Structure formats: structure tokens, C-alpha cells
Amino acid sequence: MSEIHTYIETLKKIGINGIQIIQDGQEIGCFMKKEYKRQNQYSITKSFTSAAVGFAIEEGLFELNSKVCQLFDEAIKIEDPYWNMMEIRHLLTMTMGLETPILMGDSRKTLKESDWVSYVFRQKVTEKPGTVFQYNNAGPYLLGVLIQRKTEKNLIEYLTPRLFDKLEIKPLEAEFCPKGYVFGAGGLQMNVRELGKFGQLYLQRGKWKGEQILSEKWIEESTKKQVECGDYNNSQVDGYGYLFWHLKGDAYMANGKYGQYCIVLSD
């Protein structure tokens, strides 16, 4: 325990906002610069979108191999063969094959488009879906939109009874697009302990207080390496799952843009 304390004290000196360490279901170390203050977790949001997709598939709203263009009115008339072969799994694995990443970072603030769904479907697909990894916010965004259209509840409202209530997390603040859809690729705000519950749920393969909240099979599939991700700028990353990063040594993580991490170690 003294080593944990020393480690946390070292991290505090370099200016981190918070850290929690959980082992065997118990918190063994925690620091929060501002107690319980929620902060933007950026792309960690994607892993919550992954969980929402798991619930949606289990409830029969769509399937992993459902064709994306058949699920959106904006795409019905698209004739491009690559667009028409694109499946839900390609949105989850960052293998849509778009010509360029879109809806990234600060570019959303200056984007003149008000209809982001139509904007996505106007993009060129230059690689066969499923063949090339390209980190892109378009896929997670479409997944959040799809769930809202299928259920008439936005991503937060959809996850509240299925996930947040179970974990005793008050509904999270989120980023919204101009049309009122929760941005499924970034913007969720939570504190360290709330994020820790999410990681613990995944470590426990979807079980919480004796209840199977999320499919064990879905967690296994979404956190294992589905695709290679090339020369990612983290030497511990060795692949990508369904909106989760797979790490060397049987571990995985949700990862935000500015040093936000939720790392799950199975050992």
C-alpha cells in the first residue's frame, strides 16, 4: 500500500486531476483534485457508446452485420458499393474506409453543417470497409444517432436505466450535435469514481452486485483485438476492438484525448 501511496503522490506532483486504483473490487488508492467534480472524458465516451450498442443488439434493434445504409433514410439512395457494403461492425472498429476523418476535435466548433448525419453520408469511402483502420468520429456518432432513432431516447436516456442506474451513477452531461443527438464519440462528463465503476463492470464481465447487466459475450468481443491499428502513438496498444483499445498483456482501455484513461487489467 505504501507503494500505491508513493505512486499517487508522484502523480499529484506532475499535475494530474485524478486517479483511482481498484483491486479485487476494492479501492486501494484514489486522488481527485476536485472531489467528485465531473470532467470531460473526451473519447472515453466511445466506450460507453460501445456498451449502448451491446444493449441495442441484445434487444434486437439491429445486428453487427446490419447494413448501415439500410438503417438511415439519408443513405437510402446512395449507390456507392463501398457505402452499401458497410456494416455496424465497421463503425465499431474504425474501419469505415472514409477518405478522411471527420467530426474531430475543435473542427466541430467551426463546422458549418447543421445536419451531421447527411454530412457523414456525403463523404467518400475510398477503402473497402473492414480493411483499413482509421481513427474517426463518424462511426460512433452514427451509432448514437441510430440508437436514438430506434428508441426515441438519446444515448444518455437509453443508458440510464440499463447502466447508470445499476451502477448508481447520476445521468451524465454530454455533448450534442446541432440536431439534438448526443455525440457518441466524445463529450461525456464524469468523475474518477464514476469511470472506475464502468471499468469494474467490464472487469467483472458485465456483472454488478450479482446481476448480469451487460452481456458477457459482448464485453469479451468488444474488448478483444478485432483489427490491427497500425502505428498508434502508444507502444502498449496492439489493436482495436469495438470502440475499445486492446493492450499488450491481456488488457484493454477506454482512452480520452487529453490523458484520460480507464485501463482494465484482467490479472
Locations of regions flagged by a protein language model:
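A short, well-structured edge-of-sheet supersecondary motif
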Residues: I4-E35, Y261-V264
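Active-site-proximal alpha-helical segments within enzyme catalytic domains
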Residues: L142-L146, G186-K207, Q260-D267
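Active-site Gly/Thr loop motif
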Residues: E220-S266
